[in-house]
UniProtKB/Swiss-Prot annotation:
Keyword check for DNA repair: no
Subcellular location(s) of the protein: Cytoplasm
SUPFAM superfamilies, alphabetized: GroEL apical domain-like, GroEL equatorial domain-like
EC numbers: 5.6.1.7
Organism expressing this protein natively: Mycolicibacterium vanbaalenii (strain DSM 7251 / JCM 13017 / BCRC 16820 / KCTC 9966 / NRRL B-24157 / PYR-1)
UniProt protein name: Chaperonin GroEL 1
GO cellular component: cytoplasm
Molecular functions (GO terms): ATP binding; ATP-dependent protein folding chaperone; isomerase activity; unfolded protein binding
Main location class: cytoplasm
Subunit structure, interactors included: Forms a cylinder of 14 subunits composed of two heptameric rings stacked back-to-back. Interacts with the co-chaperonin GroES.
Catalytic activity reported: ATP + H2O + a folded polypeptide = ADP + phosphate + an unfolded polypeptide
Biased composition regions of type Basic residues, renumbered to the chain: 534-544
Gene3D superfamilies: GroEL, GroEL-like equatorial domain, TCP-1-like chaperonin intermediate domain
Amino acid sequence: MSKQIEFNETARRAMEIGVDKLADAVKVTLGPRGRHVVLAKSWGGPTVTNDGVTIAREIDLEDPFENLGAQLVKSVATKTNDVAGDGTTTATVLAQAIIKGGLRNVAAGANPIALGAGISKAADAVSEALLAGATPVTDKKSIAQVATVSSRDEEVGELVGEAMTRVGHDGVVTVEESSTLLTELEITEGVGFDKGFLSAYFVTDFDSQEAVLEDALVLLHREKISSLPDLLPLLEKVAEAGKPLLIIAEDVEGEALSTLVVNAIRKTLKAVAVKAPFFGDRRKAFLDDLAVVTGGQVVNPDVGLVLRDVGLDVLGTARRVVVDKDSTVIVDGGGTQEAIEGRKAQLRAEIEASDSDWDREKLEERLAKLAGGVAVIKVGAATETDLKKRKEAVEDAVHAAKAAVEEGIVVGGGAALVQAGAGLAKLRSELSGDEALGVEVFTAALSSPLYWIATNAGLDGAVVVNKVSELPAGQGFNAATLEYGDLIADGVIDPVKVTRSAVVNAASVARMILTTETAVVEKPEESEDDGHGHGHGHHHGHAH
Protein backbone atom coordinates (compact mmCIF):
# COMPACT_ATOMS: atom_id res chain seq x y z
CA MET A 1 0.00 0.00 0.00
CA SER A 2 1.67 3.24 -1.07
CA LYS A 3 1.70 6.22 1.30
CA GLN A 4 1.32 9.96 1.04
CA ILE A 5 3.59 12.15 3.17
CA GLU A 6 3.26 15.80 4.14
CA PHE A 7 5.80 17.83 6.12
CA ASN A 8 6.05 20.81 8.49
CA GLU A 9 3.52 23.60 8.05
CA THR A 10 1.55 21.75 5.32
CA ALA A 11 1.01 18.72 7.59
CA ARG A 12 0.05 20.84 10.60
CA ARG A 13 -2.25 23.08 8.55
CA ALA A 14 -4.18 20.08 7.16
CA MET A 15 -4.53 18.61 10.65
CA GLU A 16 -5.74 21.96 11.96
CA ILE A 17 -8.53 22.01 9.33
CA GLY A 18 -9.61 18.54 10.56
CA VAL A 19 -9.51 19.70 14.19
CA ASP A 20 -11.69 22.70 13.29
CA LYS A 21 -14.26 20.62 11.40
CA LEU A 22 -14.76 18.25 14.32
CA ALA A 23 -14.65 20.92 17.04
CA ASP A 24 -16.99 23.27 15.13
CA ALA A 25 -19.55 20.45 14.88
CA VAL A 26 -19.33 19.77 18.62
CA LYS A 27 -19.09 23.26 20.13
CA VAL A 28 -22.56 24.40 19.01
CA THR A 29 -23.92 22.08 21.75
CA LEU A 30 -22.05 23.76 24.63
CA GLY A 31 -24.02 25.31 27.49
CA PRO A 32 -27.69 25.33 28.56
CA ARG A 33 -28.65 27.20 25.37
CA GLY A 34 -26.53 24.98 23.11
CA ARG A 35 -28.05 23.65 19.88
CA HIS A 36 -28.55 20.09 18.65
CA VAL A 37 -26.71 18.07 16.03
CA VAL A 38 -28.54 15.55 13.81
CA LEU A 39 -26.61 12.39 12.95
CA ALA A 40 -27.68 10.24 9.99
CA LYS A 41 -27.24 6.52 10.69
CA SER A 42 -26.54 3.86 8.07
CA TRP A 43 -29.60 2.04 9.48
CA GLY A 44 -32.64 3.30 11.40
CA GLY A 45 -33.74 6.89 11.82
CA PRO A 46 -31.45 9.85 12.49
CA THR A 47 -30.20 10.56 16.02
CA VAL A 48 -30.64 14.02 17.54
CA THR A 49 -28.07 14.72 20.25
CA ASN A 50 -26.17 17.39 22.16
CA ASP A 51 -23.60 14.98 23.61
CA GLY A 52 -20.08 15.88 22.48
CA VAL A 53 -18.60 12.40 22.43
CA THR A 54 -21.56 10.92 20.50
CA ILE A 55 -21.09 13.55 17.76
CA ALA A 56 -17.30 13.16 17.72
CA ARG A 57 -17.54 9.37 17.31
CA GLU A 58 -19.61 9.80 14.14
CA ILE A 59 -17.11 12.03 12.35
CA ASP A 60 -14.62 10.69 9.80
CA LEU A 61 -13.29 13.09 7.19
CA GLU A 62 -12.62 12.34 3.52
CA ASP A 63 -9.21 14.05 3.35
CA PRO A 64 -6.80 11.64 5.14
CA PHE A 65 -4.54 14.42 6.51
CA GLU A 66 -7.49 16.40 7.88
CA ASN A 67 -8.83 13.16 9.33
CA LEU A 68 -5.63 12.71 11.38
CA GLY A 69 -6.36 15.98 13.20
CA ALA A 70 -10.03 15.11 13.67
CA GLN A 71 -9.22 11.65 15.09
CA LEU A 72 -6.67 13.06 17.55
CA VAL A 73 -9.23 15.54 18.89
CA LYS A 74 -11.84 12.78 18.95
CA SER A 75 -9.50 10.91 21.32
CA VAL A 76 -9.73 13.91 23.73
CA ALA A 77 -13.51 13.51 23.86
CA THR A 78 -13.45 9.71 24.27
CA LYS A 79 -10.69 9.77 26.90
CA THR A 80 -12.47 12.45 28.94
CA ASN A 81 -15.66 10.41 28.63
CA ASP A 82 -13.90 7.22 29.82
CA VAL A 83 -12.37 8.92 32.87
CA ALA A 84 -15.16 11.28 33.92
CA GLY A 85 -18.21 10.33 31.81
CA ASP A 86 -18.97 13.93 30.85
CA GLY A 87 -17.23 17.19 29.85
CA THR A 88 -16.44 15.97 26.34
CA THR A 89 -17.55 19.17 24.58
CA THR A 90 -15.51 21.34 26.97
CA ALA A 91 -12.43 19.17 26.33
CA THR A 92 -12.88 19.41 22.55
CA VAL A 93 -13.32 23.20 22.59
CA LEU A 94 -10.26 23.61 24.84
CA ALA A 95 -8.14 21.38 22.59
CA GLN A 96 -9.15 23.39 19.51
CA ALA A 97 -8.29 26.71 21.17
CA ILE A 98 -4.87 25.49 22.41
CA ILE A 99 -4.05 24.01 18.98
CA LYS A 100 -5.04 27.18 17.09
CA GLY A 101 -3.11 29.47 19.45
CA GLY A 102 -0.11 27.14 19.47
CA LEU A 103 0.06 26.66 15.69
CA ARG A 104 -0.09 30.42 15.17
CA ASN A 105 3.05 30.76 17.31
CA VAL A 106 4.80 27.78 15.69
CA ALA A 107 4.16 29.33 12.26
CA ALA A 108 5.71 32.55 13.56
CA GLY A 109 8.87 30.67 14.54
CA ALA A 110 8.28 29.50 18.15
CA ASN A 111 9.91 26.23 19.22
CA PRO A 112 7.09 23.61 19.38
CA ILE A 113 8.83 21.50 22.06
CA ALA A 114 9.28 24.43 24.47
CA LEU A 115 5.77 25.66 23.65
CA GLY A 116 4.37 22.19 24.44
CA ALA A 117 6.31 22.03 27.72
CA GLY A 118 4.81 25.37 28.76
CA ILE A 119 1.30 24.15 27.88
CA SER A 120 1.77 20.96 29.95
CA LYS A 121 3.06 22.87 32.98
CA ALA A 122 0.11 25.27 32.76
CA ALA A 123 -2.38 22.36 32.46
CA ASP A 124 -0.92 20.64 35.56
CA ALA A 125 -1.04 23.91 37.52
CA VAL A 126 -4.70 24.51 36.57
CA SER A 127 -5.62 20.89 37.39
CA GLU A 128 -4.08 21.22 40.88
CA ALA A 129 -5.70 24.63 41.45
CA LEU A 130 -9.13 23.25 40.48
CA LEU A 131 -8.75 20.30 42.87
CA ALA A 132 -7.57 22.54 45.70
CA GLY A 133 -10.56 24.87 45.23
CA ALA A 134 -13.20 22.11 44.97
CA THR A 135 -16.18 21.91 47.33
CA PRO A 136 -17.05 18.38 48.58
CA VAL A 137 -20.47 17.00 47.62
CA THR A 138 -22.37 14.99 50.19
CA ASP A 139 -26.01 16.01 50.25
CA LYS A 140 -28.80 15.06 47.87
CA LYS A 141 -29.40 18.68 46.77
CA SER A 142 -25.83 19.18 45.49
CA ILE A 143 -25.84 15.83 43.67
CA ALA A 144 -29.17 16.75 42.04
CA GLN A 145 -27.76 20.14 40.96
CA VAL A 146 -24.75 18.49 39.27
CA ALA A 147 -27.04 16.04 37.46
CA THR A 148 -29.41 18.85 36.41
CA VAL A 149 -26.55 20.87 34.87
CA SER A 150 -25.32 17.80 33.00
CA SER A 151 -28.72 16.71 31.63
CA ARG A 152 -30.33 20.20 31.38
CA ASP A 153 -33.40 18.64 32.98
CA GLU A 154 -34.50 19.26 36.57
CA GLU A 155 -36.61 16.09 36.74
CA VAL A 156 -33.61 13.96 35.72
CA GLY A 157 -31.43 15.82 38.26
CA GLU A 158 -33.87 15.04 41.07
CA LEU A 159 -34.07 11.36 40.08
CA VAL A 160 -30.28 10.95 39.95
CA GLY A 161 -29.92 12.77 43.30
CA GLU A 162 -32.52 10.45 44.84
CA ALA A 163 -30.89 7.36 43.30
CA MET A 164 -27.37 8.22 44.51
CA THR A 165 -28.63 9.06 48.01
CA ARG A 166 -30.68 5.86 48.32
CA VAL A 167 -27.96 3.39 47.28
CA GLY A 168 -25.10 5.21 48.99
CA HIS A 169 -21.51 5.82 47.95
CA ASP A 170 -20.80 2.19 47.02
CA GLY A 171 -24.19 1.51 45.44
CA VAL A 172 -24.77 1.05 41.74
CA VAL A 173 -26.94 3.28 39.53
CA THR A 174 -27.94 1.88 36.13
CA VAL A 175 -30.04 3.32 33.30
CA GLU A 176 -32.61 1.27 31.35
CA GLU A 177 -35.17 2.03 28.66
CA SER A 178 -38.75 2.00 29.93
CA SER A 179 -41.73 0.74 27.96
CA THR A 180 -43.86 3.63 29.29
CA LEU A 181 -43.64 7.39 28.69
CA LEU A 182 -42.56 8.06 32.27
CA THR A 183 -39.02 8.30 33.60
CA GLU A 184 -38.95 6.72 37.04
CA LEU A 185 -36.66 5.31 39.71
CA GLU A 186 -36.67 1.76 41.04
CA ILE A 187 -34.48 0.52 43.88
CA THR A 188 -33.91 -3.22 43.52
CA GLU A 189 -31.88 -5.84 45.33
CA GLY A 190 -28.70 -6.28 43.39
CA VAL A 191 -24.96 -6.10 43.49
CA GLY A 192 -22.18 -4.73 41.30
CA PHE A 193 -18.41 -5.30 41.13
CA ASP A 194 -15.44 -4.01 39.13
CA LYS A 195 -14.71 -6.83 36.69
CA GLY A 196 -15.88 -6.83 33.07
CA PHE A 197 -16.33 -9.42 30.32
CA LEU A 198 -13.38 -11.61 29.29
CA SER A 199 -14.03 -11.13 25.56
CA ALA A 200 -15.51 -8.24 23.56
CA TYR A 201 -17.42 -10.85 21.50
CA PHE A 202 -19.89 -11.12 24.40
CA VAL A 203 -21.23 -7.58 23.71
CA THR A 204 -24.96 -7.57 22.86
CA ASP A 205 -25.62 -3.81 22.74
CA PHE A 206 -23.06 -2.31 20.36
CA ASP A 207 -24.06 1.34 20.99
CA SER A 208 -23.21 1.17 24.69
CA GLN A 209 -20.64 -1.67 24.33
CA GLU A 210 -22.43 -3.71 27.00
CA ALA A 211 -23.53 -7.31 27.31
CA VAL A 212 -27.11 -7.29 28.62
CA LEU A 213 -28.70 -10.56 29.76
CA GLU A 214 -32.41 -10.61 30.64
CA ASP A 215 -33.80 -13.34 32.93
CA ALA A 216 -30.36 -14.95 33.22
CA LEU A 217 -28.92 -18.03 34.91
CA VAL A 218 -25.75 -17.49 36.99
CA LEU A 219 -22.93 -20.02 37.40
CA LEU A 220 -20.54 -19.29 40.30
CA HIS A 221 -17.30 -21.30 40.25
CA ARG A 222 -14.51 -21.13 42.81
CA GLU A 223 -11.72 -22.28 40.45
CA LYS A 224 -10.56 -21.77 36.85
CA ILE A 225 -12.69 -23.18 34.04
CA SER A 226 -10.57 -24.21 31.06
CA SER A 227 -11.64 -27.73 30.09
CA LEU A 228 -14.52 -27.98 27.63
CA PRO A 229 -15.67 -31.53 28.62
CA ASP A 230 -16.26 -30.21 32.17
CA LEU A 231 -18.39 -27.26 31.02
CA LEU A 232 -20.21 -28.83 28.05
CA PRO A 233 -22.89 -30.87 29.92
CA LEU A 234 -24.02 -27.72 31.76
CA LEU A 235 -23.98 -25.58 28.58
CA GLU A 236 -26.24 -28.12 26.86
CA LYS A 237 -28.74 -27.98 29.76
CA VAL A 238 -28.68 -24.15 29.72
CA ALA A 239 -29.22 -24.10 25.92
CA GLU A 240 -32.22 -26.44 26.35
CA ALA A 241 -33.66 -24.10 28.99
CA GLY A 242 -33.30 -21.27 26.43
CA LYS A 243 -31.92 -18.76 28.93
CA PRO A 244 -28.75 -16.62 28.85
CA LEU A 245 -25.89 -17.55 31.20
CA LEU A 246 -23.50 -15.45 33.31
CA ILE A 247 -20.36 -17.30 34.42
CA ILE A 248 -18.34 -15.87 37.32
CA ALA A 249 -15.19 -17.88 38.08
CA GLU A 250 -11.56 -17.41 39.15
CA ASP A 251 -10.90 -17.37 35.39
CA VAL A 252 -12.35 -18.79 32.18
CA GLU A 253 -9.76 -19.66 29.55
CA GLY A 254 -8.69 -22.04 26.79
CA GLU A 255 -11.29 -24.26 25.12
CA ALA A 256 -14.03 -23.24 27.54
CA LEU A 257 -13.70 -19.52 26.69
CA SER A 258 -13.34 -20.08 22.93
CA THR A 259 -16.49 -22.27 22.91
CA LEU A 260 -18.47 -19.54 24.70
CA VAL A 261 -17.16 -16.96 22.19
CA VAL A 262 -18.08 -19.13 19.18
CA ASN A 263 -21.58 -19.63 20.60
CA ALA A 264 -21.91 -15.88 21.18
CA ILE A 265 -20.87 -15.11 17.58
CA ARG A 266 -23.26 -17.74 16.16
CA LYS A 267 -25.95 -16.63 18.63
CA THR A 268 -26.62 -20.26 19.61
CA LEU A 269 -26.16 -19.54 23.33
CA LYS A 270 -26.05 -16.12 24.96
CA ALA A 271 -23.38 -16.33 27.65
CA VAL A 272 -20.92 -13.94 29.29
CA ALA A 273 -17.83 -14.97 31.25
CA VAL A 274 -16.43 -12.70 33.98
CA LYS A 275 -13.51 -13.08 36.38
CA ALA A 276 -14.50 -13.07 40.04
CA PRO A 277 -13.15 -9.94 41.80
CA PHE A 278 -10.53 -9.86 44.60
CA PHE A 279 -8.09 -12.63 45.61
CA GLY A 280 -7.84 -15.55 48.00
CA ASP A 281 -10.26 -15.60 50.91
CA ARG A 282 -11.89 -12.29 49.89
CA ARG A 283 -12.81 -13.78 46.51
CA LYS A 284 -14.25 -16.92 48.14
CA ALA A 285 -16.30 -14.80 50.54
CA PHE A 286 -17.57 -12.55 47.73
CA LEU A 287 -18.63 -15.57 45.64
CA ASP A 288 -20.57 -16.80 48.69
CA ASP A 289 -22.24 -13.36 48.90
CA LEU A 290 -23.20 -13.62 45.21
CA ALA A 291 -24.62 -17.10 45.83
CA VAL A 292 -26.93 -15.62 48.48
CA VAL A 293 -27.98 -12.75 46.18
CA THR A 294 -28.69 -14.98 43.16
CA GLY A 295 -30.10 -17.95 45.05
CA GLY A 296 -27.48 -20.35 43.66
CA GLN A 297 -24.57 -22.38 45.00
CA VAL A 298 -20.83 -21.93 44.44
CA VAL A 299 -19.44 -24.87 42.44
CA ASN A 300 -16.54 -26.05 44.57
CA PRO A 301 -14.76 -29.41 44.10
CA ASP A 302 -13.55 -29.23 47.75
CA VAL A 303 -17.11 -29.92 48.94
CA GLY A 304 -17.88 -32.48 46.25
CA LEU A 305 -19.61 -30.11 43.80
CA VAL A 306 -17.87 -30.79 40.48
CA LEU A 307 -18.70 -28.70 37.39
CA ARG A 308 -19.14 -31.76 35.14
CA ASP A 309 -21.95 -33.14 37.35
CA VAL A 310 -23.92 -30.00 38.24
CA GLY A 311 -27.44 -29.34 36.98
CA LEU A 312 -29.54 -26.20 36.61
CA ASP A 313 -30.59 -26.45 40.28
CA VAL A 314 -27.12 -25.24 41.35
CA LEU A 315 -27.32 -22.08 39.22
CA GLY A 316 -28.52 -18.75 40.56
CA THR A 317 -30.86 -16.43 38.64
CA ALA A 318 -31.13 -12.69 37.95
CA ARG A 319 -33.78 -10.57 36.25
CA ARG A 320 -31.10 -8.57 34.47
CA VAL A 321 -27.33 -8.58 34.18
CA VAL A 322 -25.33 -5.73 32.59
CA VAL A 323 -21.62 -6.28 31.88
CA ASP A 324 -19.24 -3.80 30.25
CA LYS A 325 -15.45 -3.92 29.87
CA ASP A 326 -14.83 -2.88 33.50
CA SER A 327 -17.85 -3.82 35.59
CA THR A 328 -20.72 -6.23 36.18
CA VAL A 329 -24.12 -5.39 37.69
CA ILE A 330 -26.58 -8.08 38.76
CA VAL A 331 -30.10 -6.70 39.23
CA ASP A 332 -32.87 -8.54 41.10
CA GLY A 333 -31.06 -11.77 41.94
CA GLY A 334 -33.15 -14.84 42.72
CA GLY A 335 -32.01 -15.08 46.37
CA THR A 336 -34.71 -14.90 49.05
CA GLN A 337 -35.05 -11.80 51.20
CA GLU A 338 -34.53 -13.90 54.36
CA ALA A 339 -31.24 -15.33 53.07
CA ILE A 340 -29.96 -11.87 52.12
CA GLU A 341 -30.98 -10.38 55.49
CA GLY A 342 -29.34 -13.35 57.24
CA ARG A 343 -26.12 -12.75 55.32
CA LYS A 344 -26.18 -9.04 56.23
CA ALA A 345 -26.68 -9.89 59.91
CA GLN A 346 -23.76 -12.34 59.75
CA LEU A 347 -21.51 -9.66 58.19
CA ARG A 348 -22.54 -7.10 60.83
CA ALA A 349 -21.66 -9.61 63.56
CA GLU A 350 -18.25 -10.24 61.93
CA ILE A 351 -17.61 -6.46 61.77
CA GLU A 352 -18.40 -6.18 65.51
CA ALA A 353 -16.10 -9.08 66.34
CA SER A 354 -13.19 -8.02 64.10
CA ASP A 355 -10.17 -6.44 65.77
CA SER A 356 -8.30 -5.68 62.53
CA ASP A 357 -9.03 -2.34 60.86
CA TRP A 358 -8.21 -3.76 57.43
CA ASP A 359 -10.57 -6.73 57.85
CA ARG A 360 -13.29 -4.48 59.21
CA GLU A 361 -12.98 -2.14 56.22
CA LYS A 362 -13.26 -5.05 53.76
CA LEU A 363 -16.26 -6.51 55.61
CA GLU A 364 -17.94 -3.09 55.54
CA GLU A 365 -17.34 -2.92 51.77
CA ARG A 366 -19.06 -6.30 51.34
CA LEU A 367 -21.96 -5.21 53.54
CA ALA A 368 -22.33 -1.97 51.53
CA LYS A 369 -22.48 -3.99 48.29
CA LEU A 370 -25.17 -6.25 49.75
CA ALA A 371 -27.13 -3.53 51.55
CA GLY A 372 -26.81 -0.78 48.94
CA GLY A 373 -28.78 -2.50 46.25
CA VAL A 374 -29.04 -1.15 42.72
CA ALA A 375 -30.91 1.97 41.65
CA VAL A 376 -32.44 1.56 38.20
CA ILE A 377 -33.54 4.73 36.40
CA LYS A 378 -36.08 3.71 33.75
CA VAL A 379 -36.15 6.29 30.97
CA GLY A 380 -39.36 6.80 28.99
CA ALA A 381 -40.16 9.03 26.00
CA ALA A 382 -42.72 9.43 23.23
CA THR A 383 -40.52 8.45 20.26
CA GLU A 384 -37.52 6.21 19.66
CA THR A 385 -35.29 9.20 18.76
CA ASP A 386 -36.36 11.09 21.87
CA LEU A 387 -35.79 8.01 24.02
CA LYS A 388 -32.19 7.59 22.81
CA LYS A 389 -31.42 11.27 23.42
CA ARG A 390 -33.01 11.22 26.89
CA LYS A 391 -31.26 7.99 27.89
CA GLU A 392 -27.92 9.52 26.84
CA ALA A 393 -28.65 12.62 28.95
CA VAL A 394 -29.53 10.49 32.00
CA GLU A 395 -26.36 8.38 31.60
CA ASP A 396 -24.24 11.56 31.41
CA ALA A 397 -26.00 12.92 34.51
CA VAL A 398 -25.25 9.72 36.47
CA HIS A 399 -21.55 9.86 35.45
CA ALA A 400 -21.35 13.54 36.40
CA ALA A 401 -22.97 12.89 39.80
CA LYS A 402 -20.56 10.01 40.53
CA ALA A 403 -17.59 12.20 39.55
CA ALA A 404 -18.87 14.99 41.84
CA VAL A 405 -19.16 12.66 44.84
CA GLU A 406 -15.62 11.41 44.15
CA GLU A 407 -13.66 14.69 43.93
CA GLY A 408 -16.10 17.53 44.65
CA ILE A 409 -17.43 20.41 42.54
CA VAL A 410 -16.30 23.77 41.14
CA VAL A 411 -18.32 26.65 39.67
CA GLY A 412 -19.66 25.72 36.24
CA GLY A 413 -20.43 27.68 33.11
CA GLY A 414 -16.75 27.92 32.12
CA ALA A 415 -16.11 30.37 34.98
CA ALA A 416 -13.79 28.05 36.96
CA LEU A 417 -11.43 27.82 33.96
CA VAL A 418 -11.34 31.58 33.34
CA GLN A 419 -10.65 32.21 37.02
CA ALA A 420 -8.01 29.45 37.20
CA GLY A 421 -6.31 31.15 34.24
CA ALA A 422 -5.81 34.27 36.35
CA GLY A 423 -3.59 32.23 38.68
CA LEU A 424 -1.15 31.31 35.89
CA ALA A 425 0.59 34.72 35.92
CA LYS A 426 3.00 33.48 38.64
CA LEU A 427 3.93 30.38 36.61
CA ARG A 428 4.47 32.51 33.52
CA SER A 429 6.86 34.81 35.36
CA GLU A 430 8.94 31.80 36.48
CA LEU A 431 9.41 30.57 32.89
CA SER A 432 11.12 32.24 29.97
CA GLY A 433 11.10 32.22 26.18
CA ASP A 434 8.76 29.87 24.34
CA GLU A 435 7.79 27.98 27.54
CA ALA A 436 6.31 31.22 28.90
CA LEU A 437 4.61 31.65 25.52
CA GLY A 438 3.06 28.17 25.99
CA VAL A 439 1.55 29.33 29.30
CA GLU A 440 0.13 32.39 27.51
CA VAL A 441 -1.42 30.23 24.76
CA PHE A 442 -2.97 27.98 27.41
CA THR A 443 -4.27 30.91 29.49
CA ALA A 444 -5.98 32.40 26.43
CA ALA A 445 -7.53 29.01 25.55
CA LEU A 446 -9.08 28.63 29.03
CA SER A 447 -11.71 31.24 28.19
CA SER A 448 -12.93 29.36 25.07
CA PRO A 449 -15.60 27.19 26.81
CA LEU A 450 -17.17 30.31 28.40
CA TYR A 451 -16.88 32.16 25.07
CA TRP A 452 -18.93 29.45 23.31
CA ILE A 453 -21.45 29.06 26.15
CA ALA A 454 -22.17 32.81 25.82
CA THR A 455 -22.10 32.79 22.00
CA ASN A 456 -24.55 29.85 21.88
CA ALA A 457 -26.82 31.86 24.19
CA GLY A 458 -26.84 34.65 21.57
CA LEU A 459 -24.48 37.07 23.35
CA ASP A 460 -21.07 38.48 22.47
CA GLY A 461 -18.66 35.88 23.87
CA ALA A 462 -15.70 38.25 24.23
CA VAL A 463 -17.73 40.74 26.33
CA VAL A 464 -18.95 37.97 28.67
CA VAL A 465 -15.42 36.53 29.09
CA ASN A 466 -14.09 39.98 29.95
CA LYS A 467 -16.81 40.58 32.55
CA VAL A 468 -16.43 37.14 34.20
CA SER A 469 -12.63 37.53 34.46
CA GLU A 470 -13.25 40.59 36.69
CA LEU A 471 -15.77 38.83 38.99
CA PRO A 472 -14.69 37.29 42.33
CA ALA A 473 -14.27 33.49 42.60
CA GLY A 474 -17.58 31.63 42.68
CA GLN A 475 -19.30 34.27 40.56
CA GLY A 476 -19.89 33.90 36.84
CA PHE A 477 -22.32 33.98 33.93
CA ASN A 478 -25.49 31.88 34.11
CA ALA A 479 -26.42 31.21 30.47
CA ALA A 480 -29.81 29.74 31.46
CA THR A 481 -31.00 33.04 32.97
CA LEU A 482 -28.55 35.29 31.03
CA GLU A 483 -27.48 36.89 34.32
CA TYR A 484 -24.23 37.26 36.25
CA GLY A 485 -24.17 36.08 39.85
CA ASP A 486 -23.26 33.44 42.42
CA LEU A 487 -23.13 30.27 40.31
CA ILE A 488 -22.91 27.83 43.22
CA ALA A 489 -26.10 29.27 44.76
CA ASP A 490 -27.77 29.06 41.32
CA GLY A 491 -26.72 25.41 41.02
CA VAL A 492 -24.46 26.03 38.00
CA ILE A 493 -21.72 23.62 39.05
CA ASP A 494 -19.45 21.04 37.43
CA PRO A 495 -17.71 18.01 38.96
CA VAL A 496 -14.03 18.97 39.36
CA LYS A 497 -13.02 15.56 37.98
CA VAL A 498 -14.79 16.38 34.70
CA THR A 499 -13.19 19.83 34.38
CA ARG A 500 -9.71 18.52 35.30
CA SER A 501 -9.93 15.63 32.81
CA ALA A 502 -10.97 18.06 30.08
CA VAL A 503 -7.99 20.36 30.80
CA VAL A 504 -5.34 17.62 31.01
CA ASN A 505 -6.55 15.63 27.98
CA ALA A 506 -6.95 18.74 25.80
CA ALA A 507 -3.40 19.89 26.63
CA SER A 508 -1.96 16.44 25.93
CA VAL A 509 -3.46 16.15 22.43
CA ALA A 510 -2.70 19.79 21.56
CA ARG A 511 0.93 19.15 22.45
CA MET A 512 1.01 16.12 20.12
CA ILE A 513 -0.32 18.11 17.17
CA LEU A 514 2.00 21.09 17.80
CA THR A 515 5.08 18.85 17.79
CA THR A 516 4.10 17.01 14.58
CA GLU A 517 6.60 17.54 11.75
CA THR A 518 5.50 14.78 9.36
CA ALA A 519 2.14 13.17 8.59
CA VAL A 520 1.97 9.82 6.75
CA VAL A 521 -1.34 8.47 5.41
CA GLU A 522 -2.40 5.71 3.04
CA LYS A 523 -2.85 6.78 -0.55
CA PRO A 524 -6.49 6.48 -1.69
CA GLU A 525 -6.89 3.47 -4.00
CA GLU A 526 -9.51 4.82 -6.45
CA SER A 527 -6.99 6.71 -8.60
CA GLU A 528 -5.21 3.48 -9.57
CA ASP A 529 -8.15 1.55 -10.98
CA ASP A 530 -10.18 4.36 -12.46
CA GLY A 531 -10.07 2.68 -15.87
CA HIS A 532 -11.35 -0.64 -14.55
CA GLY A 533 -14.06 1.16 -12.63
CA HIS A 534 -15.51 2.72 -15.77
CA GLY A 535 -15.34 -0.55 -17.68
CA HIS A 536 -17.08 -2.34 -14.83
CA GLY A 537 -19.89 0.21 -14.73
CA HIS A 538 -20.24 0.05 -18.51
CA HIS A 539 -20.59 -3.70 -18.41
CA HIS A 540 -23.41 -3.40 -15.87
CA GLY A 541 -25.15 -1.00 -18.19
CA HIS A 542 -25.33 -3.70 -20.85
CA ALA A 543 -26.48 -6.35 -18.40
CA HIS A 544 -29.62 -4.35 -17.73
